[in-house]
C-alpha cells in the first residue's frame, strides 16, 4: 500500500494514548522575524489566564525560541515509551521543543527537511500532552517541508497568520 492508495484521513497522526486535544492551532508566517513566536507565547498565556488548558509544540526546529520566552532551562524527560513536556512555572503550560532535548541548547540543528518533519510529528505522537483545550503549534517561517508535513499529518483546526505591515504594504 502506498500513500496514493490511502485516504487522507489515514495519513493523520494520532496523539499519544491518554492525550486529548480540543483544537490544534498552527501559528505561521511567510518569513522569519515577524513575531510569530511572540504571538504564540502571548496567545498561550492569554488562554491559560482565561482557564483554558493550553500547550505549545515548538515546530521551529532550526530556530526554537519558545523555551527561552518562558524561561525554561530544564530538559524534557522520557521513558521507554513517551516524552514528557516541560511545564512553565507560573501558568503550568506544557512545552515541547528541540531545545528541551539537546544537551547544549545553543548547538545548531542542521537537519534535512524530512528529519525535521519527522521530529515535529513525534512531538505530537510521542509526547504525553495530557488533556488540552488548545495545542498551539509554533511553525517555522515559510511554507517548506515542515509546514506541509504538519498540515498533512496533524488534525489542524485553524491557523493564525502573522505578518508585518511592511510585508502587506509591498503587496498593495
Feature-to-residue mapping (PLM):
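Phosphate-binding loop that captures ATP/GTP phosphates
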Residues: 53-55, 59-105, 110, 117
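Amphipathic alpha-helical transducer elements in NTP-driven molecular machines
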Residues: 18, 63, 80, 113-121, ...
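Walker A/P-loop phosphate-binding motif and the immediately C-terminal alpha-helix
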Residues: 23-61
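Short, well-ordered alpha-helices that flank and scaffold nucleotide-derived cofactor binding pockets
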Residues: 45, 49, 125, 152
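Switch II (G3) loop of P-loop NTPases
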Residues: 78, 98-114, 121-149
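Extreme N-terminal, non-catalytic leader segments
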Residues: 1-31
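Conserved catalytic-core segment of NTP-binding enzymes
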Residues: 133-134, 140-172
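Residue-level signature of catalytic and energy-coupling elements of molecular machines
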Residues: 21, 32, 58, 66, ...
Amino acid at each position: 500500500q502506498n500513500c496514493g492508495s490511502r485516504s487522507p484521513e489515514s495519513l493523520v497522526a494520532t496523539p499519544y494514548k491518554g492525550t486529548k486535544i480540543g483544537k490544534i492551532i498552527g501559528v505561521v508566517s511567510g518569513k522569519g522575524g515577524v513575531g510569530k513566536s511572540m504571538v504564540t507565547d502571548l496567545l498561550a498565556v492569554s488562554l491559560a489566564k482565561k482557564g483554558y488548558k493550553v500547550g505549545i509544540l515548538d515546530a521551529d526546529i532550526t530556530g526554537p525560541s519558545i523555551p527561552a520566552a518562558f524561561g525554561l532551562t530544564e530538559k524534557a524527560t522520557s521513558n521507554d515509551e513517551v516524552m514528557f513536556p516541560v511545564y512553565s512555572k507560573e501558568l503550568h503550560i506544557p512545552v515541547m521543543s528541540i531545545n528541551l532535548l539537546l544537551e547544549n541548547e545553543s548547538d545548531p540543528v542542521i537537519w534535512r527537511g524530512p528529519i525535521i518533519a519527522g521530529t515535529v510529528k513525534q512531538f505530537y505522537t510521542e509526547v504525553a500532552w495530557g488533556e488540552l483545550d488548545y495545542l498551539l503549534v509554533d511553525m517555522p517561517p515559510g511554507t517548506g517541508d515542515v509546514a506541509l508535513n504538519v498540515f498533512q499529518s496533524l488534525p489542524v483546526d485553524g491557523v493564525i497568520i502573522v505578518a508585518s505591515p511592511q510585508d502587506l504594504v509591498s503587496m498593495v
